[in-house]
Amino acid sequence: MTDITKLCDRAYYVFDFRVLEKRVAYLRDLLGTKADIAYAIKANPFLVEGLRNQVERLEICSPGESEICDSLGIDPRMTVISGVNKTPAFIEKLVKNTDGRIYTVESLTQFELLAALAEKYGKRLKVLLRLTNDSQFGINEEDIESIIENRERYPQLDFRGLQFFSGTQKTSLKKLKRELVHLDELLLRLEEQYGYRSPELEYGTGFPVAYFGEDLEEEALITGFRQLLEEMRWQGHITLELGRSIAASCGSYFTHVADKKRNHGQNYLILDGGMHQMIYFGQYMGMKQPKVALCGKEDRQPTDQWNLFGSLCSMNDILVKALPLPEVEIGDTLRFYNTGAYCVTEGMALFLSRDLPAVYLIDSEGNLILARRTMETFPLNTPNQEI
């Protein structure tokens, strides 16, 4: 098999679908058969192909993500259209040309838009009412109750239920319980006061990933969460929206040592990547140490500590501080683990007009696929001379 540590002479990513499939199977085993899984594409769009047969739904949060799914031939009936800024043109295009999608309602404006478009095109649209978590997302309980109370005015809408998501990296079972209890009470109130039995709840769990060696009892957390679902008085179809928890472990980021130096007693490695290409959630000025390996020298003992900086002309472009490494040379390759979620897309990609890293995929059969070549960004930052 190809040595994935030597695929490119510049920084690059590798996402392994085999690891991805094992991760989904592991989560399903812990969660049981009660819940379906929706993958949030924003975590990593390069994984859509690897997950299309592994999850029940794909969560789309932008027109660009919709285009990605269309280019891959994803069945529209598998998609949920979410996001706070659903432009009329984007939603009308979807309503006019496709059937079977689910649309989230993030505001009363979106609600009226969906109702109007459904009537215009003679379609019955599936909608999920998103409950706010006291942020810019979703609508209040009072708005949800008003919509449900007056639902007969909107026969063109199929009210599928509620959606809720409050954030990522949740390590507290107590917090998850508080949210589910609140949702349980609202779902029961809708039934008791308005005669509406919600068919479905879509819930974003925000399960955490241990990027920096944290003591995370994941199995206990997820099995405890499963018990909370089973204790809900409302009983209906549950879909769990997952992104980071599914994707993180399948990814590795490879970057090369471009230079090395010692300044006033501190060792520095300059890498051909940096924070414009790779960033961990919770990483701040390299203060936390993710799992990193010096490729080909994993079995050697550390000989010194090194500060790992990227290629940007910025004091902030530090990936790791005081990382113990074996003897390291210019040209060596470093591998950053658990980079499958968000790392590839959250960096400041256009800063200093540096390159976008290549992306490789390993499919379920072990075949290596070049999903994106190294791309220069300077054309995007070059002023257009048109008048």
Q: What feature does the model see in each segment?
A:
Residues L20, K42, S62, L94, ...:
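Conserved, mostly hydrophobic/aromatic
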Residues P45-L47, E67, T168-S172, F207-Y211, ...:
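Flexible loop/turn segments at secondary-structure boundaries
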